[in-house]
Amino acid sequence: MIILDTNVLIDFDRYLFDAGEAYAASILSRAELEFGVQAATSPEQIAKRTQRLNQLDARFDWLPMDKESTRSYGLVAAGAKATGAKVRGKDALIAAQAHRHGAGVMTLNVDDFKPFAHLVTVLTPTPRLGIVD
């Protein structure tokens, strides 16, 4: 299983995914996406972000932050802190969910997950051909 970080979910259609792989999304990312809807400053932004969130709701059963994930959080966050790395809360929580499920994390911000790479595989998405920033 691979957990998709929020930044991958935002532009989900821009990336290629392996049909043989299981992909998941964290309830923490859903919270960030919901914040994006609520913080939008125009009706167009609200509509676009709401549509994206509805599409993702239809595609994913959001992984909960359960008791086992909190145990993993203690492990990954303490391990990162012991190396002197700055522990970013949301990223550590998503890394903990990945650790708990034996999953990797796919993100555009690999550096944000480097402190947890000793316990969680960190991947970057492959862009679809013809799509450029």
Over which residues does each language-model region extend?
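Short, well-structured N-terminal submotif of metal-dependent ribonuclease cores
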Residues: M1-N54, I131-D133
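Residues at the C-termini of beta-strands that transition into short coil/loop
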Residues: N7, I27-S29, D66, N109, ...
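Residue-level signal for well-ordered alpha-helical positions
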Residues: Y15-L16, G36-A40, V76, T83, ...
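Structured helix-beta-strand junction loops
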Residues: A19, L56-R59, T83, H101, ...
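Conserved beta-strand scaffold positions in the cores of enzyme catalytic domains, especially
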Residues: A22-Y23, W62, V122
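Short, hinge-like loop/turn segments at secondary-structure boundaries
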Residues: A40-E44, A80-K81, V122-P125
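Active-site neighborhoods of divalent-metal-dependent phosphate/nucleic-acid chemistry enzymes
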Residues: D61-L108
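Acidic, PIN/NYN-like endoribonuclease modules and their adjacent C-terminal/linker elements
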Residues: A95, H99-D133
